[in-house]
Amino acid sequence: MTQTDLNNTEQKPVMVLKVGGALLQCDMGMSRLMQAAAKIIASGQPIIMVHGGGCLVDEQLKANGMITEKLDGLRVTPEAQIPVIVGALAGTSNKTLQAAAIKAGVTCLGMSLADAGMMNAKIKDPLLGLVGEVEPKDASYLEFVLAKGWMPIVSSIAISEQGEMLNVNADQAATALAKLVSGSLVLLSDVSGVLDGKGQLINSLNREQVNELTKIGVIEKGMKVKVEAALDVAESMGQAVQIASWRHAHQLIALCQGEAVGTQIQP
């Protein structure tokens, strides 16, 4: 590698990669994703991985005799459910991903949004219970970890100044992290991107188009939250955000090489 290559490598922005959905229940999917991440990191592209774990949370709540309720695509989080949700996300989900990363040869660090003062967190809406919203605060810990060549794996659990453990939507957590490190944002889901009313992939969307598709019910529930998070970053940072599928992990490498994958949310 030439000095020019090294300089180009050093200038690569951090890729904030949000994963979730059924990925955590698919060993092959996790393996392929982490192998792709290993190649990307080896090329000099730093990655922060952010995750939810809704499927596991649903399972754990059901096992504990608790009901899952959602409002506009966001999980309602009563105080009684917090121990289960925190355990599923910051515990089992985080360590499951960390194990897959280590198996793929990725040096990684499991953490949450509450670590090292990286985020300010508060309750989003009393109607949602202990659901949090976060704002970027201090990137120094993440910068230290990334400078070591390690991959942070961040669960979407935050803690408020009042000491409340809060469940943050993982797409919104990824948005805040992308802003914190001025990075590019890729939101991976169970589907290949945003689909139209006929189930066909939409290659590119702007706010006006999103508003229209939301109005007619094509974009709804969890995808609505995801697209709104993507628009937030696209507009505030002036760069496109990708929504793609974890099922096609090789596309991440293509994305790093400048190719478009999934749906691009335009500023």
From Swiss-Prot:
* Function per UniProt: Catalyzes the ATP-dependent phosphorylation of N-acetyl-L-glutamate.
Q: What class of enzyme is it?
A: transferase
UniProt name for this protein: Acetylglutamate kinase
Which HAMAP family does the UniProt entry name for this protein?
A: ArgB (MF_00082)
Marked site: Transition state stabilizer: 18, 226
Entry GO MF terms: acetylglutamate kinase activity; ATP binding
Compartments, as annotated in UniProt: Cytoplasm
GO annotation, cellular component aspect: cytoplasm
Q: Where does substrate bind?
A: 53-54, 75, 167
Q: Its Enzyme Commission number?
A: 2.7.2.8
Q: In which pathway does it act?
A: Amino-acid biosynthesis; L-arginine biosynthesis; N(2)-acetyl-L-ornithine from L-glutamate: step 2/4
Q: What Gene3D superfamilies is this protein classified in?
A: Acetylglutamate kinase-like
Keyword Disulfide bond listed? The answer is no
InterPro entries, from UniProt? AceGlu_kinase-like_sf, AcgluKinase_fam, ArgB, Asp/Glu/Uridylate_kinase
Encoding gene per record: argB
